[in-house]
Design a protein with these regions (language model features):
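Short, well-ordered alpha-helix to beta-strand connector turns
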Residues: 61, 84, 116-117, 158, ...
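Catalytic nucleophile loop
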Residues: 88-90, 113-132
Length: 219
């Protein structure tokens, strides 16, 4: 299984190179499906969403399709994913994304699809790949989902936890001591990555790709 777990998407040349190394094709020969449901519940200005798509457009891909699994039937989105090289899971709310991965049935068939495709996660799209969504830590670090009382099982593709947006002014990931305190009771390795960093994962083997900052806990 090949995964590229990012905080902010394809934000620099190093992350772009990692993507095409995983795909094994040139950009102009690569097709991508953009999967946006995590963003649907986020309020306010969506300039970040537009910027994520612009970054993809600037890669000069063969094709960028959009398939919202919360809005269209499986018979419409599945053939498009089967024809793509990259499945790109946009950021937003990780719980909303995981709910629709389950409701749509995509969570069940992703392991088969990923035998031949590359999974790319952006923020929430990266967070859902762990064994669970780390509710308590997410509440502390992102100040969201306070109404939730129970954690949610993730895709369980990786055996670590991914926390995006290190040093972002919008979240509580500005200080290392806050993050360290928040994740101290997590059993397993923790990566906190800024928007210029990513993890390239091939069959469980992890490579850090970064032109920015990142922190690793519980090594």
């Amino acid at each position: 299984m090949k995964l590229l777990l990012t905080s902010g998407g394809i934000t620099n040349k190093s992350i772009a190179n990692a993507l095409f190394d995983l795909v094994g094709k040139k950009p102009e020969d690569t097709s991508l499906v953009f999967i946006p449901p995590a963003s649907n519940v986020e309020k306010g200005d969506k300039d970040w969403f537009i910027n994520d798509l612009v970054n993809l457009k600037n890669l000069n891909l063969k094709e960028i399709d959009i398939a919202d699994i919360s809005a269209i039937d499986k018979k419409l989105w599945l053939p498009r994913m089967e024809d793509a090289d990259v499945l790109f899971f946009e950021g937003g709310n990780s719980y909303h994304l995981m709910e629709w991965l389950n409701k749509s049935g995509l969570a069940q068939i992703l392991p088969e699809l990923l035998k031949t495709k590359v999974y790319v996660g952006l923020s929430a799209g990266s967070m859902v790949t762990g064994k669970d969504l780390a509710l308590i830590q997410s509440q502390i670090l992102y100040g969201e989902d306070w109404e939730r009382k129970e954690d949610m099982v993730g895709l369980n593709f990786v055996d670590f936890y991914f926390f995006p947006h290190l040093n972002s002014p919008y979240f509580n990931l500005r200080k290392e001591d806050i993050i360290k305190e928040a994740v101290k009771n997590i059993k397993g390795k923790v990566f906190a990555m800024d928007d210029n960093s990513a993890l390239k994962v091939i069959d469980g083997k992890i490579e850090i790709i970064s032109e920015g900052k990142y922190l690793v806990f519980n090594e």
